[in-house]
């Protein structure tokens, strides 16, 4: 059953144009929102097992910015990379080439959510030119350490089992309805039953839109093999960190510690939300983005 987005009406105010470009062997699909002649362009990178729909609630609240939102290679409608692993280095190299393929008149602001925060940080630390960087729910510390280390290891075993089993059984395991629902319940913090129902529907609709088992397992291995703290000291552009006080993936202490590693960063902690800021607090995130960029406006 399709549950209507609580942000659908706002999104109609910034209709999307779909495009396609070949990058490192991936036929990468992307969506553009806002005026093409805007002063500021923002390229947004979604999280693990997500695709471009995930960040649309934030985009729906923004006006006056050109926003380019691709599906990561191997997820959504984008085909996998060719000749590159789906690890942080591979995705960072793809992001550099994707930005170049957009033929922009000026460097784009780069935004990443969750797993996307690692990809973006790696790319910018490696030389991707951007005037500013925004990380939403940044992965601030190693996933195999801290309070969720055991769960991360168990999840890794789950993904590797999904790859090792016969294809039909493995695909069924990796896309299992109960597993997706458990993940969604674990991440959602909102007490609003309507919003929670929509969040769960989003995960069931989009969380299993990946190309093949190798891609999804490589992606998870990448998500736990690196974190933003590994790249922070090499990033000297102004950086906005949008964190959350109930994020089950990254503790408040880890978020505070991450801020100190950047030469020029500000940390804004949203209250009453966890790892799904883009679903549960999109207006607040959009307001922080507009203020940080000193451009655009809220819908």
Which stretches of residues belong to each language-model region?
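Active-site loop/oxyanion-hole signature of alpha/beta-hydrolase fold enzymes
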Residues: 23-26, 31, 69-115, 125-126, ...
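Conserved HGGG/HGGXW glycine-rich cap/lid loop of the alpha/beta-hydrolase fold
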Residues: 26-77
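Short glycine-enriched nucleophile-adjacent loop
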Residues: 117-128, 133
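Flexible "cap/lid" loop of the alpha/beta hydrolase fold
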Residues: 132-168
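Conserved alpha/beta-hydrolase catalytic His-Asp/Glu region
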Residues: 168-233
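Short beta-strand/loop motif that positions the catalytic acidic residue
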Residues: 235, 241-243
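Acidic catalytic loop of the alpha/beta-hydrolase fold
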Residues: 246-250
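Catalytic histidine-centered segment of alpha/beta-hydrolase-like enzymes
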Residues: 273-283
């Amino acid at each position: 059953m399709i549950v209507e987005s609580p942000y659908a009406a706002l999104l109609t105010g910034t209709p999307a144009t779909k495009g396609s470009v070949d990058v490192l062997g991936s036929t990468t699909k992307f969506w553009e929102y806002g005026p093409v002649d805007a002063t500021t362009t923002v390229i947004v990178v979604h999280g693990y097992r997500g695709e471009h729909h995930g960040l649309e609630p934030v985009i729906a609240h923004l006006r006056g910015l050109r926003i380019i939102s691709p599906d990561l290679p191997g997820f959504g409608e984008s085909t996998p990379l060719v000749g590159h692993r789906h690890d942080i280095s591979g995705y960072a190299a793809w992001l550099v080439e994707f930005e170049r393929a957009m033929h922009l008149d000026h460097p784009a602001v780069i935004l990443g959510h969750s797993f996307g925060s690692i990809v973006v940080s790696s790319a910018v630390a490696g030389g991707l030119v951007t005037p500013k960087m925004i990380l939403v729910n940044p992965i601030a510390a190693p996933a195999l350490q801290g309070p969720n280390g055991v769960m991360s290891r168990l999840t890794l075993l789950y993904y590797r089992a999904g790859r090792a089993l016969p294809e039909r059984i493995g695909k069924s395991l990796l896309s299992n309805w109960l597993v997706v629902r458990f993940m969604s319940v674990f991440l959602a913090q909102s007490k609003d039953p309507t919003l929670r129902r929509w969040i769960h529907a989003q995960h069931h609709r989009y969380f299993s839109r990946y190309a093949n088992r190798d891609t999804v397992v490589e992606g998870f291995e990448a998500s736990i093999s690196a974190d933003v703290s590994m790249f922070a000291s090499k990033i000297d552009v102004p950086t906005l960190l949008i964190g959350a006080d109930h994020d089950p993936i990254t503790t408040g202490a880890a978020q505070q510690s991450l801020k100190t590693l950047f030469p020029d960063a500000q940390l804004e902690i949203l209250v009453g939300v966890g790892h799904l800021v883009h679903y549960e607090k999109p207006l607040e995130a959009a307001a922080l983005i507009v203020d940080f960029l000193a451009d655009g406006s809220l819908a």
